[in-house]
Amino acid sequence: MFKKLFGQLQRIGKALMLPVAILPAAGILLAFGNAMHNEQLVEIAPWLKNDIIVMISSVMEAAGQVVFDNLPLLFAVGTALGLAGGDGVAALAALVGYLIMNATMGKVLHITIDDIFSYAKGAKELSQAAKEPAHALVLGIPTLQTGVFGGIIMGALAAWCYNKFYNITLPPFLGFFAGKRFVPIVTSVVAIATGVLLSFAWPPIQDGLNSLSNFLLNKNLTLTTFIFGIIERSLIPFGLHHIFYSPFWFEFGSYTNHAGELVRGDQRIWMAQLKDGVPFTAGAFTTGKYPFMMFGLPAAAFAIYKNARPERKKVVGGLMLSAGLTAFLTGITEPLEFSFLFVAPVLYGIHVLLAGTSFLVMHLLGVKIGMTFSGGFIDYILYGLLNWDRSHALLVIPVGIVYAIVYYFLFDFAIRKFKLKTPGREDEETEIRNSSVAKLPFDVLDAMGGKENIKHLDACITRLRVEVVDKSKVDVAGIKALGASGVLEVGNNMQAIFGPKSDQIKHDMAKIMSGEITKPSETTVTEEMSDEPVHVEALGTTDIYAPGVGQIIPLSEVPDQVFAGKMMGDGIGFIPEKGEIVAPFDGTVKTIFPTKHAIGLESESGVEVLIHIGIDTVKLNGEGFESLINVDEKVTQGQPLMKVNLAYLKAHAPSIVTPMIITNLENKELVIEDVQDADPGKLIMTVK
């Protein structure tokens, strides 16, 4: 149950990134538009007073502001799109549902335009400060103020309606409304019910949120910033940080702007204060990112490079330079964080604590810098330096230098003191035991602590999954020495990455435990999977095309630590939008897992690719999959390989994200194209 809930939270967190991804563009428009009539800048560049320039700046500012003003609607549409696999019908249903939900709440609670507007000086002016802040005008509808929470709720419900009813059949006389056309209809009914329910349930929630907001922001804000920084970074590996920071950025706190509008949420308040030209009071939950993203993590990258073995410095240097520069410029830190998260968790613990102190220090110094994307140099210029007199952004530089020094020396000390296997410090060569292929299942069973220590045994095409009684009896180093490319430990659950032979090992281990296999000569592990390295260097150059219609995401965003950590190899994540997986190149089918959820292919030039459809889909036991090919069959690029029931997978698997891994990259170079929207004819990767 927890695992399923965790998977759903990951999907929601990922879905929230879609509306959040719009904010950088809106923020840039707002920041530049506002900056173009900034008094200090106008004094330096008087030409900014030109009427045409003033009009352009006003349009830019208004274009950016309207996005922030309608965030709840964007969250409704974005959440629905994310949870429904990107189908536009779900987005339309969310839009309709959001409007109906707000209209329903307004009518049930008898909210009128007079509850929103006050009349003064003969004109209608928005005066939320003098009215009930629990009410709002949403796209012309007087209603209850539910903020982005209302948008997320309606978006999630619209996605549920889509996944539940998108292929519904109706009697012939209602046939026009069958299938996807039925989704907005049923969503409308759900929206009415939701509006009625929220009319009575949301006011107490509002009171609770306001009380929590007052406690966190007014009574104990200093401690809150520290705790916020720790929790936000701690959730990065699980992909749940988007869920955590959303209330702080978009709901907690309130400010009435010069137009009389009530603005909620730390990020939105900062943007409103930027436009109003008043001193900043918001930014406590954004500013803390700048010191560790721009200075701390790049310094940590240098410490990792410095401690790499001499023969590995060139490779590690390139990796760390790229990751460190990305963190500095854009605030995208996952490539760097994931480079040491799995191999040296103690470093990530240090990083989490330092991130918390960064938020605390920035708050104590009164630095207030907003952001839309992340705490990199680009946002620092737009929202910090251009407003340096109000934001006190210059203090980030000395504080950042201190953090760079602290990060460097703490990482350097920990790496040497605890002999951490950071990039470039891995064992030069894992000793391979003198174990015949046939004896491998016996040796793996012994390394897991023996028959009595096995509580549950399972496998998929990438890994051996074992739940043990006593984890202390497991010889992790021994498992790696037997050929596992990595071992993941979650509680008493061990995942050993043996690649395609994992299922054969599991099969033989089960037979050994039951007494059906008593000697190595009776095992079924094949010769080709044993003493020879699992990976074979590819020959030639291979173009790899998209395996279907969908979205391409970085491998680091795949919600599975084994794939995201590149334990199986490098590649990309693919989010299918249609239920057909096709061949990414001309080649041969090498493996089809018994549960049909994974396919191994080999190109004509020798590149081996694993397509793993969904996450934890091995547990579906083949339900939702229809194989269209056989092992050893020749295939051509674009040829259908598998039919997939996406609706079934969305309902029964943690995620439909499909890792596409190059399993024998070795010393070859993988070039990943800058592609997001993909179809079978689009190039996504090249192995050189």
From Swiss-Prot:
Topology of the protein relative to the lipid bilayer: Multi-pass membrane protein
Intracellular or extracellular location(s): Cell membrane
Entry EC no(s): 2.7.1.-
One Pfam family recorded for the sequence: PTS_EIIA_1
GO biological process terms held by the UniProt record: D-glucose transmembrane transport; phosphoenolpyruvate-dependent sugar phosphotransferase system
Keyword ATP-binding belongs to the record: no
Active-site residues, as the UniProt record annotates them: 460 (phosphocysteine intermediate), 612 (tele-phosphohistidine intermediate)
Main location: membrane
Keywords of the record: Cell membrane, Kinase, Membrane, Phosphotransferase system, Sugar transport, Transferase, Transmembrane, Transmembrane helix, Transport
UniProt cross-references to InterPro entries, sorted A to Z: Dup_hybrid_motif, Glu_permease_IIB, PTrfase_EIIB_Cys, PTS_EIIA_1_perm, PTS_EIIC, PTS_EIIC_1, PTS_Glucose_EIICBA, PTS_IIB_1
Molecular-function GO terms, alphabetical: D-glucose transmembrane transporter activity; kinase activity; protein-N(PI)-phosphohistidine-sugar phosphotransferase activity; protein-phosphocysteine-sugar phosphotransferase activity
Domain PTS EIIC type-1: 3-427
Location of the PTS EIIA type-1 domain: 560-664
Domain PTS EIIB type-1: 438-519
NCBIfam families registered for this protein in UniProt: EIIB_glc, PTBA, PTS-II-BC-glcB
PANTHER family noted in UniProt: CYTOCHROME C-TYPE SYNTHESIS PROTEIN AND PTS TRANSMEMBRANE COMPONENT, PTS SYSTEM GLUCOSE-SPECIFIC EIICB COMPONENT-RELATED
Entry domain remark: The EIIC domain forms the PTS system translocation channel and contains the specific substrate-binding site. The EIIB domain is phosphorylated by phospho-EIIA on a cysteinyl or histidyl residue, depending on the transported sugar. Then, it transfers the phosphoryl group to the sugar substrate concomitantly with the sugar uptake processed by the EIIC domain.
Name of this protein: PTS system glucoside-specific EIICBA component
Organism ancestry: Bacteria, Bacillati, Bacillota, Bacilli, Bacillales
